[in-house]
């Protein structure tokens, strides 16, 4: 997958100056190194991912703001169900290497849990609503503990520290607010309810995943007491 395909849209390019876009492109190598570390620590291949130029945010009634720096998104592809990680350009632009690694490692846990639940059809029984033949998957719901997945203890410590109570990085948050949101760079407002993806049950039932990935997930389940 072309990580930067969203920036090929002329309408997107008009939203940023050339210098800013160039700075994003230059940090792609940092993103790739962070992905490699997650892969090495887990012994698994990271799913496809791309950089999203429009920042998803949520404003609550009390004036607080939540930023979706990355999201795990299942979607219906021509070949069946597929899963992609959406990485925000804001995170790539303003995030430190340790924060980018932590966010990617966190999303990878969401990815593994989603594959686990779909492969066992748990997501069907959990989330089909009423008589509507579709299921809802929330990116914020369930997650596998990092120590069951990652052999890299430093990465596990960083992940637990950064996500002790939601994601915590004041410097990244301040830069995102001051240099992205307050300066009018593109955002899309998503409530927690809207940050959900509808997946047809027929697609879930026909889903196929890499046998090696499923075997590793079963090993993780045993460690976590989920088997």
Per-segment meaning from a language model:
Residues 116-168:
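Post-HExxH zinc-binding segment in Zn-dependent metallohydrolases
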Residues 24-47:
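Zn2+-dependent metallopeptidase catalytic core
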């Amino acid at each position: 997958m072309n990580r930067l395909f969203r920036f090929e849209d002329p309408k997107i390019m008009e939203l940023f100056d050339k210098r800013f876009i160039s700075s994003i492109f230059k940090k792609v190598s940092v993103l790739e190194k962070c992905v490699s570390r997650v892969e090495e620590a887990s012994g698994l291949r990271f799913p496809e991912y791309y950089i999203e130029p429009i920042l998803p945010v949520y404003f609550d009634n009390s004036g607080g703001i939540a930023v979706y720096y990355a999201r795990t998104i299942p979607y219906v592809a021509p070949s069946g169900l597929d899963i992609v990680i959406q990485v925000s350009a804001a995170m790539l632009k303003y995030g430190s290497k340790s924060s980018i690694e932590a966010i990617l490692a966190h999303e990878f846990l969401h990815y593994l849990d989603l594959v686990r639940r779909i492969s066992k059809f748990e997501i069907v029984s959990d989330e089909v609503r009423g008589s509507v033949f579709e299921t809802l998957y929330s990116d914020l719901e369930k997650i596998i503990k990092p120590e069951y997945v990652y052999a890299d203890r430093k990465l596990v410590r960083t992940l637990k520290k950064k996500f002790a109570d939601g994601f915590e990085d004041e410097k990244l948050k301040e830069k995102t607010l001051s240099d992205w949101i307050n300066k009018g760079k593109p955002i899309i407002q998503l409530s927690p309810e809207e940050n959900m993806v509808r997946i047809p049950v027929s697609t879930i039932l026909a889903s196929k995943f890499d046998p090696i990935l499923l075997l590793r997930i079963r090993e993780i389940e045993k460690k976590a007491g989920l088997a």
